[in-house]
From Swiss-Prot:
This is Rhodopsin. Disulfide bonds join C110-C187. It is found in: Membrane; Cell projection, Cilium, Photoreceptor outer segment. Keywords: Cell projection, Chromophore, Disulfide bond, G-protein coupled receptor, Glycoprotein, Lipoprotein, Membrane, Palmitate, Phosphoprotein, Photoreceptor protein, Receptor, Retinal protein, Sensory transduction, Transducer, Transmembrane, Transmembrane helix, Vision. The record marks E113 as: Plays an important role in the conformation switch to the active conformation. The lineage of its organism: Eukaryota, Metazoa, Chordata, Craniata, Vertebrata. It comes from Lithobates pipiens.
């Protein structure tokens, strides 16, 4: 056994020398030098410094401009809300515990931080699934007469919360548990032990299949079909410069979405799955800390990718920041056209990214 398992924690270090202590009571500087904990705290402070204003601006601009309250933007707004959960209820706690070198808020605080971090991440993930399905239905038209309306958007938002709660709530009630991970200053689902008392093995399998693999398959399928549909439309309308431009824009958008999704979650999921399938193997605290903390950056680039690349939202944001005037003079009509994706044929208004 290359780790030390306690009643409510797992330290990735053998206790042969007797130095291992509970991460709820003592600094964990035997796992890593104090300066490394300071780096984590500084990193979390940077995420808070960037995440709060970006996500606040997302919510504020949407509230200020009625034309942004479209069905599609409800899902984008949901991303902003869940990112706030991650920043306010997760990042602030992690920054504070990193400064102290251990999880100073005890087991209750660990469950609190782990729950909200998981909830925020899962809401974001399932929001991306709903976005992918919406893009697929509107652009590829598997149902010819279907129009994505406000009721569908609200159902999509409710769906993201239901699925997120289905992942984040069970550890609170005895199906798995939240424990400190990596350098022991942030909490997550227990991938480190089988812990039969809380049926940990079945929960981890359920989480990987239902809350990671299935969303990834859905997103890949929807955006793959979207790219094919756009290419077919461009081939049929070769003289249309606007369609060709729209094809490039949506292809770029899809590539950015897929790449950043993979960059954000695959390293964390891979490391967690490796640890779970290699119980008792030797690994250092940094092995889990780096991907876990990097995944938290999704609260920053999610709004950048899914909202800042939305031309209509971007124009409204500039107008808000510039006290009601847009110095760049972008035409709202063109912005509005990009959001009307329910037209009867695949055209610029359908394949634009917003």
């Amino acid at each position: 056994m290359n780790g030390t398992e306690g009643p409510n924690f797992y330290i990735p270090m053998s206790n042969k020398t007797g130095v291992v202590r509970s991460p709820f009571d003592y600094p964990q500087y035997y796992l890593a030098e104090p300066w490394k904990y300071s780096v984590l705290a500084a990193y979390m402070f940077l995420l808070i410094l960037l995440g709060l204003p970006i996500n606040f601006m997302t919510l504020y601009v949407t509230i200020q401009h009625k034309k942004l309250r479209t069905p599609l933007n409800y899902i984008l707004l949901n991303l902003g809300v869940c990112n706030h959960f991650m920043v306010l209820c997760g990042f602030t706690i992690t920054m504070y515990t990193s400064l102290h070198g251990y999880f100073v808020f005890g087991q209750t605080g660990c469950y609190f931080e782990g729950f909200f971090a998981t909830l925020g991440g899962e809401i974001a993930l399932w929001s991306l699934v709903v976005l992918a399905i919406e893009r697929y239905i509107v652009v590829c038209k598997p149902m010819s007469n279907f129009r994505f309306g406000e009721n569908h958007a609200m159902m999509g938002v409710a769906f993201t919360w239901i699925m997120a709660l289905a992942c984040a709530v069970p550890p609170l009630f005895g199906w798995s548990r939240y424990i400190p991970e990596g350098m022991q200053c942030s909490c997550g689902v227990d991938y480190y032990t089988l812990k039969p008392e809380v049926n940990n093995e079945s929960f981890v399998i359920y989480m990987f299949v239902v809350h990671f693999l299935i969303p990834l398959i859905i997103i890949s399928f929807c955006y793959g079909r979207l790219v094919c549909t756009v290419k077919e439309a461009a081939a049929q309308q070769q003289e249309s410069a606007t369609t060709q431009k729209a094809e490039k824009e949506v292809t770029r958008m899809v590539i950015i979405m897929v790449i950043f999704f993979l960059i954000c979650w695959v390293p964390y999921a891979y490391v967690a799955f490796y640890i779970f399938t290699h119980q008792g193997s030797e690994f250092g605290p940094i092995f889990m800390t780096v991907p876990a903390f990097f995944a938290k950056s999704s609260a920053i680039y999610n709004p950048v990718i899914y909202i800042m690349l939305n031309k209509q939202f971007r124009n409204c944001m500039i107008t808000t920041l510039c006290c009601g005037k847009n110095p760049f003079g972008d035409d709202d009509a063109s912005s509005a056209a990009t959001s009307k994706t329910e037209a009867t044929s695949v055209s610029t208004s359908q394949v634009s990214p917003a």
